[in-house]
Amino acid sequence: MQAVKCVIVGDGAVGKTCLLISYTTNAFPNEYIPTVFDNYSATVMVDSKPINLGLWDTAGQEDYDRLRPLSYPQTDVFLICFSVVSPPSFDNVSSKWQPEVSHHCPKTPCLLVGTKLDMREDKEQLKRLEEKKITPITTEQGEAKCKDIGAVKYIECSALTQKNLRLVFDEAVRAVISPAGGAKKDKKNNRGCLLF
């Protein structure tokens, strides 16, 4: 069975851990606790193929900038996450996360993931954003950022409602087992990211 290592990166509090917990347990955590989610492994079916999917959560806070890359070796695909209701987290995709990932793992595919999709229409959230004179990130902005950073796909999702949640992880697996460029990766000779 093919194994796929998927590492999730992005600013603190954009919903990375909620994404993983909702996907793996079908339950949404009610409180924010900075990353305590351990590595998770599950057998999933993608395009009728069994895949051993390893999910690695990372801390987004600056305090962990030197430790976070230790989880990158052997990564097959990255999910670069931002919250659609946090323009600063969106800006950090191109100023921090894509440069960090491409520095350590230049040939590893990335998906851009807009989280908290359910909050884009939330009246309370929109009021808070309006008070700060900012607006939610649009789908078009996400798609443009995807092209700008060279990500293979842009997907918006909600861990709360689970809208597009499974799609995020299915597409992450597809980026590894069926890359758009044609030939599949030879797992023996090209195993994702290597750090020396």
Swiss-Prot record:
Which residues are GTP-binding? 13, 15-18, 32, 35, 60, 116, 118, 159
* Activity regulation (record text): Regulated by guanine nucleotide exchange factors (GEFs) which promote the exchange of bound GDP for free GTP, GTPase activating proteins (GAPs) which increase the GTP hydrolysis activity, and GDP dissociation inhibitors which inhibit the dissociation of the nucleotide from the GTPase.
| Residue span of motif Switch 2 | 57-75
In Swiss-Prot or TrEMBL terms, this protein is called Rho-related protein racA
**Propeptide cleavage-removed residue intervals:** 194-196
Record's bilayer topology term: Lipid-anchor
Cofactor(s) the record lists: Mg(2+)
One of this protein's Pfam families, by short name? Ras
Encoding gene, per UniProt annotation: RACA
Q: Motif Switch 1, which positions?
A: 26-37
Identify the keywords attached in UniProt to this record, alphabetized: Cell membrane, Cytoplasm, Cytoskeleton, GTP-binding, Hydrolase, Lipoprotein, Magnesium, Membrane, Metal-binding, Methylation, Nucleotide-binding, Phagocytosis, Prenylation
One MF term in the entry's GO annotations? GTPase activity
Function, in words: Small GTPase which cycles between active GTP-bound and inactive GDP-bound states. Involved in cytoskeleton remodeling. Plays a role in phagocytosis of bacteria and host erythrocytes. Involved in capping of surface receptors. May be involved in cytokinesis.
Q: What is known of its domains?
A: The switch 1 and switch 2 motifs undergo large conformational changes during GTP/GDP cycle and play important roles in the interaction with downstream effectors.
Top-level taxon of the source organism = Eukaryota
Q: Give binding positions for Mg(2+).
A: 17, 35
Which parts of the sequence carry Cysteine methyl ester? 193
